[in-house]
């Protein structure tokens, strides 16, 4: 009997070691031979229930494998699509199916979180990936919210997921009222930080005001449990700073155009008349551009491109 127990224990250890080795080998292979888009055209198992049955006691390890594939798929697809610029418009298929550019992303994330329903990083990262507009993501805030709500069904006390749902509503569906409602709901969870209440009030009162956007990203950064999310919040805050600078520079360009009777189309002409000291750089260190019609904008080569689409102000609530 003891012999059987030892044999079974050894078999389990061997199985875990082999699966871990397979993950390492696959990761090394992907680094050496980056995959193309066609290779990722199928998901290993399409049914979360089937995946759980196949993984048996190793569902958490299997979730790690699917999470790695999710990251590889998202990163590889994003690099491929962004390398196809300057065709910045989404493909026609996106008009009918907004996830056409990343068709496997949600299925992979759904499998990952079904195998490990407490996979916090997969919910929070995955929601950002899903909500990102094309070509940086599939532009599916509805699926981002669905993923976070799936996490909330497992952990109703996870105020961070409610915060993220509000964030998706604010930035991607441009529904400031729904965002404020999510922040308000999160603020009532035991252990939630005090600033959620003020964030809800600010969002409801100011709507699309850039200051409330900045406050929101500061809140996301404060709640981030991993460095990547903090870095993403820093990038978004830099984008907001760039929008402030673009407004200021646009005022300079418009003033010069009014005085000179024609719009400047480059920075040297503004430097010569002494209205700016040099070529203005965005927070990432790339020069801003002046379009032919005199509009100041971010360079498409900047890490801050594309600039965020700012939410609109909240409409007044109709009387009861």
Ranges and model annotations:
Residues 25-111, 118-172, 177, 184-185:
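Short coil/linker segments at helix-helix boundaries
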Residues 64, 132-134, 205-320:
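Low-complexity, acidic interaction segments enriched in glycine
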Residues 177, 185, 197, 202-210, ...:
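Soluble catalytic domains of enzymes that build or remodel membrane lipids, polysaccharides, and related
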Residues 1-6:
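Short, Lys/Arg-rich N-terminal segment immediately upstream of the first membrane anchor
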Residues 124-126, 141-142, 159-165, 177, ...:
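Alpha-solenoid helical repeat scaffolds
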Residues 115, 154-155, 188-189, 222-225:
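Structural marker of alpha-solenoid helical repeat scaffolds
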Residues 118-120, 158, 192-193, 210, ...:
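Residue-level recognition of tetratricopeptide repeat
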Residues 7-24:
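Hydrophobic membrane-insertion alpha-helices, especially the h-region
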